[in-house]
Amino acid sequence: MLISSDSVNRLAEYVENRDEVFCSGLFLSARWMIVSQLDHIGIQMIILPDRDSAEYCAADLYHLIEGDRVYFLPDSGKNLERSNYKSSLGVQRTSAIGKILEYKEGEQVIVVTYPSALEEVIPEKGRISGSLLKLTVGEERSYEDIKEILFSSGFERVDFVSEPGQFAVRGALIDIFSYSFNNPFRISFFGDEIESINIFDANTQLSKEKVEYVDIYPDLSSSEDEEGSMVTDILPADTLVWMDSSDMYKDRQFFQELNRFRRIYMELPLSRQDEEAVRFNISPQPVFNKNFELLTDDIR
């Protein structure tokens, strides 16, 4: 798939100088190639119609972009029964929210989400900061202090951790399964000093990686407090938002909140014929229905 560098350069220029930019001729995965080529500094949030389309987009971007820069922000699955899938949604949501809160100027971060995930209330920023447990190799921290913070953040003490929201104490070790990571952490102490921090496999108990510090997040996937915050409340002012169309979400709760951010619309709405739209002129992939003769003719 060939994408004109002139169109990408024009898009980058418009993004720097306009509050909203309209595109035309962008189809399917070509959109995510454009996102990967834009090389934008800051947070980019891609809002798609539903969970399935957002998951597919995130999967494409994982392959297109190197490093841990892509985050999927799903809903909390609060109406689902307890399961590994619901637990996975909570981890991904907390991880994405945590990354937004930890964002440092100059980073490149992409968050993929959808309306129902944006409209769920999250804890207020102050409450999140108060329940965040930061641990660093070499610092002095008492067992009791750590256990008290974990209990107050809703963590459950168990014999062996197996899922997010659990911790275990064994001798000079504390195992903690954070809500923002797919594997638990093993904190090793020498007296009251943190001697080492290891990421380990909960099934095999084998160490996977040694790290120098860790941020242990409680469950940020939703909030029981109706007066909590929205995800849009914690986004930096220079966030760049991608959406399908300006017409698609205009009646949704979150849409008006997005007016304070720069926006890229990946479709030119019927209500607007903008001669200044960035045109990519990419044709949608034909449907061949396993007819290889048609496929051969198309390639030729």
Spans of features found by a protein language model:
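ASCE RecA-like P-loop NTPase motor cores
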Residues: 1-300
